[in-house]
Design a protein with these regions (language model features):
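Compositionally biased terminal segments of proteins
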Residues: 1-160
Length: 160
């Protein structure tokens, strides 16, 4: 993980580009877990779900204009690298479209972003955790995220 990568700058640039494109979107993944649970959480990238019907070529152009470099193309996602070094994954999944519609605008470090609801984030994490093809370490992280989202939040004043 690149310690100099700037998640907030990457997120700001991605959100601005998607808004200018008119692409419906919402923050998902570890960043969303941190925002929703109130517990900062290490994550290897920044994940943003975009409506599955978006024009991918227009999206690639918009993110490139915002300073992101395309690093991978997959059936349901595009991977980018922000100029700060932060990896960004844009996810296209028809099952996420209703979740994007239900996403709520929240303030995160002075940035107004749409984040999927806690209930939808738990559903996403449950789906991922039970995927037999998912790496075990990721599935375990998904299960821990579910518990955080359900309120099992550590008290900074509690002992071991």
């Amino acid at each position: 993980m690149d310690e100099s990568a700037d998640k907030l700058a990457a997120l700001a640039d991605v959100v601005r580009a998607l808004d200018q494109l008119g692409a419906s979107h919402a923050v998902v993944g570890g960043v969303a877990v941190g925002i929703r649970s109130g517990v900062p959480r290490a994550t290897i990238d920044t994940d943003v779900a975009v409506r599955s019907t978006v024009d991918r070529h227009a999206l690639i152009d918009a993110l490139a204009a915002a300073g992101l470099r395309l690093t991978g193309t997959f059936a349901h996602s595009l991977n980018f690298r922000h100029s700060s070094g932060e990896p960004v994954q844009i996810v296209f999944d028809p099952e996420f479209d209703p979740m994007i519609d239900r996403a709520e605008p929240l303030d995160a470090e002075g940035l107004r972003i749409r984040v999927v609801t806690t209930a939808d984030l738990i559903a996403m994490k449950q789906r991922a955790a039970t995927d037999p093809a998912r790496r075990r370490s990721k599935a375990l992280r998904d299960q821990a995220d579910i518990e955080l989202l359900r309120g099992d939040v550590p008290d900074p004043d509690e002992g071991w």
